[in-house]
Regions:
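Long non-globular sequence segments
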Residues: 354-356
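Glycine-/small-residue-rich beta->alpha transition segments that form the dinucleotide
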Residues: 52-64, 92, 125, 209
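C-terminal catalytic lobe of FAD-dependent flavoproteins
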Residues: 3-9, 13, 71-121, 127-334, ...
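Helical element adjacent to the flavin cofactor pocket in flavoenzyme catalytic cores
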Residues: 1-54
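Glycine-rich, histidine-containing beta strand-loop boundary motifs that form or position
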Residues: 23-25, 31, 59-60, 91, ...
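Flavin (primarily FAD) binding-site architecture
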Residues: 57-73, 217
Length: 356
């Protein structure tokens, strides 16, 4: 599963249903005023206010920090941060299989085919204490994952075989478990008890992306009494953007190769995986790669860059290469610099257009 892509398409769907998506924005404070929440937000060093009837604190690793710092309140529960890290190496085997490797410490490690050319290996479970804004894989974690692979595969890995890595922290509900791997992965929803006409606060402790819809429905169930006209649950049958009229990646790839002159199969496959049927929105009226604008390399064209900036809130080259396309594994420094220069010009033109 491409977790970053899942988050983006959910944001797209929410936007299409009327939500306002505000990226690169920080909440400075939230206070109760006349039965509603008044939030002060910061975007590009500019402050502004919005009001809300309910506040959902789904800030993950910062759930208790938000309560303490932005709300000036005491959290009702605590969290434990557990670091999980992955490494990416050249594909270990040609078959489309995933492996679950049982280690002698009773943990399991997954090996999953990743982006056709690579294998994704993970994850670790390490207690984390530090700044959740800055999380990196450690040498010990890298060695641990390599050792697990070498215990199970004839092909032996070395640290220099690691092409890339990434690490994150899981914000888990603190159930007083002594081992990081034993901490509950279940979510806990903590609803404030408003007095008089105060607006409610719902804080989400724990949870994971694989059960995000279940968590969201449980959260809305708790909020239903504050919104008597709330509709019934509907997401079980709802398709995410890009799944409309979509049959399979293979069928869509064939359609793209037939419709777009000069398109490489690898790019068609990436588009089909990333955008689904929304790929036609991205392409517009273009029927030839020669009309897709500047080529940044590795199948990334100006047409796609403009689309993810305009429709998917991408701002930086990191947004595009790492969070939208995964092409960071192929781009070198000069290619990334060319994309950065184009984005600077694009943002300048958009600002001038807004000013006009």
């Amino acid at each position: 599963m491409d977790d970053a892509r899942l988050v983006v398409v959910n944001a797209i769907q929410a936007h299409e249903l009327g939500a306002q998506i505000r990226t690169q924005t920080r909440c400075i404070s939230a206070v109760q005023q006349e039965g509603v929440w008044c939030l002060t937000l910061e975007h590009q060093k500019q402050h502004y206010q919005i009001k809300a009837r309910t506040l959902v604190n789904a800030t993950g690793a910062w759930v208790t920090d938000f309560i303490q710092q932005q709300l000036s309140k005491t959290p009702k529960a605590g969290i434990r941060l557990v670091q999980g890290s992955h490494i990416i190496v050249k594909r270990l085997y040609p078959e489309p299989h995933a492996f679950i490797l049982q280690n002698d410490d009773q943990r399991i490690v997954f090996v999953i085919p990743y982006l056709d050319e690579y294998s994704l290996i993970g994850t670790t479970d390490v207690e984390f204490e530090g700044d959740a804004n800055h999380v990196y894989i450690t040498e010990q974690e890298t060695a641990y994952l390599i050792d697990v692979i070498n215990d199970h595969f004839k092909l032996q890995l070395q640290p220099e075989d690691v092409i890339s890595s990434f690490a994150g922290v899981r914000a888990l509900y603190d159930d007083a478990s002594t081992q990081a791997s034993k901490v509950t992965r279940d979510y806990v929803l903590a609803m404030s008890k408003p007095v008089a006409d105060e607006a409610p606060l719902l804080s989400v402790y724990g949870g994971k992306l694989t059960t995000y819809r279940k968590l969201a429905e449980a959260a809305l169930l708790q909020l239903k009494r504050y919104f008597p006209h709330m509709k019934a649950e509907w997401t079980a049958e709802a398709k995410l953007p890009g799944a409309e009229g979509f049959s399979s990646v293979e069928v869509l790839c064939a359609e793209l190769m037939h419709e777009i002159k000069g398109l490489e199969s690898q790019t068609a496959h990436r588009w089909a995986n990333s955008y689904g049927s929304r790929v036609w929105h991205m392409l517009g009226e273009n029927k030839d790669v020669q009309t897709l604008g500047q080529s940044f390399g590795h199948g990334l064209y100006q047409q796609e860059v403009d689309y993810v900036v305009k429709r998917e809130w991408a701002v930086s080259s990191k947004d595009i290469l790492k969070r939208r396309t995964k092409l960071y594994l192929k781009f070198d420094a000069l290619e990334t610099q060319a994309l950065d220069l184009y984005l600077q010009d694009l943002h300048l033109r958009r600002m001038q257009g807004d000013a006009a």
